Amino acid sequence: MLTQEQLTMMAENVARIREKMAAAARETGRDPADILLCAACKTRTVEEVIASAVLPIDLFGENHVQELVEKTDANAYCGKPGHFIGHLQTNKVNKVVGRAALIESVDSEHLLQKVERAAAAANLTQEILIEINIGGEESKSGVSAESLWPLLDMAAAQPHIRLRGLMAIPPAAATPDETRAFFAQMRELLAKAADRHYENAKMDILSMGMSGDYPDAIREGATIVRIGTAIYGARDYSKKA
């Protein structure tokens, strides 16, 4: 059972985040309503997620398939969309397709083909983003900026996939200036992708920015920011969702 103190903390945190989001948007002449707040709820319990769903959070993001399944089965998002934002193993695609409103982390032709087959079998259209490894880190998932274009072409040609945009996580060790430059590079990549005018795509989503850098992500064009600890507090990895 969550305490009143925990509930108040979450409400105050979300209000503070919303204020910062709006300020960053206005600095660059953007409408704050055009930027969505994704609560990254990895390791958070069903109870925590349900409690946060009444707050001005637009959607929820899951890194682990088991947590997406448990929370969607429990209706923890209370009617708000759930996105899959973590590395997706091909053997778990069937559990995610149709559950996640948007899979943000498609990063290979093999994974793309698995998503297409699962969506076809379920007779639905799955929306996706392509994840870019913008910092070229060997330890991270994501396609390189150079390899993006053939993957985009392939994604746009799939009958049961709708391509919506790009996602990225800059290197954690990057300085604020370096991080903002990575965000600017993502904005430019999305603009170039949109200029390809795919028929079966709407390149309007740029998912980037987390608890430590989301204002700069918004200044550089993010349409979704993914925020976890700044909403819920420090993660306890011993807890099971």
Which ranges hold each PLM region?
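Gly/Pro- and small hydrophobic-enriched strand-loop and loop-to-helix capping segments
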Residues: 222-240
